[in-house]
Amino acid sequence: MCPCPHSQAQGETDGEAEWHNAALDFTHAMSYGDYLKLDKVLDAQFPLSPDHNEMLFIIQHQTSELWMKLMLHELRAAREHVKSGKLGPALKMLARVSRIFDQLVHAWAVLATMTPTEYNTIRPYLGQSSGFQSYQYREIEFILGNKNATLLKPHAHRAELLAALEQALHTPSLYDEAIRLMAAQGLPVSQERLARDAAAGTCYEASVEAAWRQVYQAPERYWDLYQLAEKLIDLEDSFRQWRFRHVTTVERIIGFKPGTGGTEGVGYLRSMLDTILFPELWRLRSNL
């Protein structure tokens, strides 16, 4: 026990001062580690190379997948709330998704401590595995409206994952539901847009911009839709920053070498920067 006179408050016993009455016996109770299943989580890192730096590479990607799991949890629920017209909860969930993207943006700085020399040591052990094959990331893209049936192919060897992604492909996106909600409130969205195949993905449609323009020109009248539009812009803004930081991190580590999954690496990632999730919301800013 530390003899320092400042180590305990007046009137406390030595035991109380040291442990602050914290529970210490978990023989018949659930502990922190039990609740979080830390035995499983912390036993899921299996480096294939002898290199010290591979642990960083694994944990960077595993933690990203955990954040994406939470993102999907929020996006699925937000989509259902938008579908039912309950925008209050949806706005909170979308704000949380934006903050998750911010968290992932900052996380790239940790991976960026890996040098090209260090990465080249572990690269031969990675085979063809690549973040391009992340099924959670693919579902996030599908929920946000960036859909392409070709991207189901990397998951054909996992029947349960393929089925889940096929369902996500054919389910209306979050943005589809926002557009339907505008139409339900009497805003001028074309029937062609409302009847469009959900698997086709988002593309610009003039009537949707016209509807959003009415929302922005009368925010007091359409306050909930106005707030929804701004939350969608926040989300895509954060998503774009995450993508840009991804490109920069990959370029500083591997340069312009091909990616492990067979893509052009940085060239492929740069092409993804041109993807626009909610095109009408961006274009109307030039036309207000």
Swiss-Prot record:
Molecular function per GO: heme binding; metal ion binding; tryptophan 2,3-dioxygenase activity
Cofactor note: Binds 1 heme group per subunit.
Pathway the protein takes part in: Amino-acid degradation; L-tryptophan degradation via kynurenine pathway; L-kynurenine from L-tryptophan: step 1/2
Signal peptide residues on this chain, from the entry's feature table: none
Entry's EC annotation: 1.13.11.11
Entry keyword Magnesium: no
GO biological process, one term: L-tryptophan catabolic process to acetyl-CoA
UniProt: substrate binding residues: F57, I58, I59, Q60, H61, Y119, R123, T260
Residues holding heme: H246
Known cofactor(s): heme
Catalytic activity: L-tryptophan + O2 = N-formyl-L-kynurenine
Keywords: Dioxygenase, Heme, Iron, Metal-binding, Oxidoreductase, Tryptophan catabolism
SUPFAM superfamilies xrefs: Indolic compounds 2,3-dioxygenase-like
UniProt function note: Heme-dependent dioxygenase that catalyzes the oxidative cleavage of the L-tryptophan (L-Trp) pyrrole ring and converts L-tryptophan to N-formyl-L-kynurenine. Catalyzes the oxidative cleavage of the indole moiety.
Quaternary data: Homotetramer.
Name by which UniProt lists this protein: Tryptophan 2,3-dioxygenase
Species the sequence originates in: Pseudomonas aeruginosa (strain ATCC 15692 / DSM 22644 / CIP 104116 / JCM 14847 / LMG 12228 / 1C / PRS 101 / PAO1)
Gene designation: kynA
